[in-house]
Amino acid sequence: MNIKKAFSNSLLSLLYKKPLSKITIGDLLEDTELSRQTFYNHFLDKNDLIAYVYDTVIVNRFNEGFIFLYAV
């Protein structure tokens, strides 16, 4: 299991339910069924997770959009 991916997917899923400012580490742990120690073994804090999601998910989707535009 890719732990970082599990937490990033959880964050993206929780964003459909509540604003980012209201999402807690506890929410992520409940959603992923992983431990707090596991979270902190992979991320410094929630902001570190947000940066990871930005770098790995959002930037990739943004770049895929440009690839699509250039292909047309």
In which residue ranges do the predicted regions lie?
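Contiguous, function-dense segments enriched for cysteine-driven chemistry
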Residues: T32, Y54-D55
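Helix-turn-helix
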Residues: K17-N47
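Short, structured secondary-structure boundary patches
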Residues: K4, K46, V59-R61
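Amphipathic alpha-helical linker/stalk segments
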Residues: S13, I23, D55-V72
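Short, amphipathic alpha-helix enriched in basic
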Residues: N2-T24
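A short hydrophobic/aromatic micro-motif that marks alpha-helical segments and, especially, helix-coil
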Residues: F39, I50, V57-R61
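DNA major-groove recognition helix of helix-turn-helix
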Residues: F7, L11, F43, I50, ...
